[in-house]
Amino acid sequence: MGVTKKPDLTDPVLRAKLAKGMGHNYYGEPAWPNDLLYIFPVVIFGTIACNVGLAVMEPSMIGEPANPFATPLEILPEWYFFPVFQILRTVPNKLLGVLLMAAVPAGLLTVPFLENVNKFQNPFRRPVATTVFLIGTVVSIWLGIGAAMPIDQSLTLGLF
């Protein structure tokens, strides 16, 4: 637990700043609810106003109309579903593919229990969590790139 220095209210410079009302928060005033109930609506309404302004100034086209008689040869999902699509596409048994997809969050839930004795927040001092993150990132990128390729090149990414 850190040691915090309390403000010296007998300091004339500090008293002059406080008398001018510099800063919204005064010493001893809690941040919740005084500050946060003031700041949150301003940020939320500002974000909504910026989004509405951008949507009005730059309307994008919805796209070309769908033609039910001309289907594409291979239907691809959105880019963020590429790794999951690649798992389902390459695993021959669909039940095994669904179980592999369910194993990803189940495996991530076990990481804190594997490293529960380690109290450090530095990633270099938590080797299990860092290794799981790096391997998961590489595998997700590999599966995502492979999903956009034909099935015969998807596992090797066309390199071999």
Swiss-Prot record:
It comes from the Eukaryota. One of its GO terms (cellular component) is chloroplast thylakoid membrane. CDD domains: cytochrome_b_C. The chain crosses the membrane at residues 36-56, 95-115, 131-151. Pfam families: Cytochrom_B_C. It is found in: Plastid, Chloroplast thylakoid membrane. The keyword Thylakoid applies. SUPFAM superfamilies: a domain/subunit of cytochrome bc1 complex (Ubiquinol-cytochrome c reductase) (SSF81648). Keywords: Chloroplast, Electron transport, Membrane, Photosynthesis, Plastid, Thylakoid, Transmembrane, Transmembrane helix, Transport. GO terms for biological process: mitochondrial electron transport, ubiquinol to cytochrome c; photosynthetic electron transport chain. GO terms for molecular function: electron transporter, transferring electrons within cytochrome b6/f complex of photosystem II activity; electron transporter, transferring electrons within the cyclic electron transport pathway of photosynthesis activity; ubiquinol-cytochrome-c reductase activity. InterPro entries: Cyt_b/b6_C, Cyt_b/b6_C_sf, Cyt_b6/f_cplx_suIV, Cytochrome_b_C_euk/bac. The keyword Transmembrane applies. It is a multi-pass membrane protein. HAMAP family: Cytb6_f_subIV (MF_01344). The 4 large subunits of the cytochrome b6-f complex are cytochrome b6, subunit IV (17 kDa polypeptide, petD), cytochrome f and the Rieske protein, while the 4 small subunits are petG, petL, petM and petN. The complex functions as a dimer. Component of the cytochrome b6-f complex, which mediates electron transfer between photosystem II (PSII) and photosystem I (PSI), cyclic electron flow around PSI, and state transitions. Belongs to the cytochrome b family. PetD subfamily. This is Cytochrome b6-f complex subunit 4. It comes from Zygnema circumcarinatum. The gene is petD.
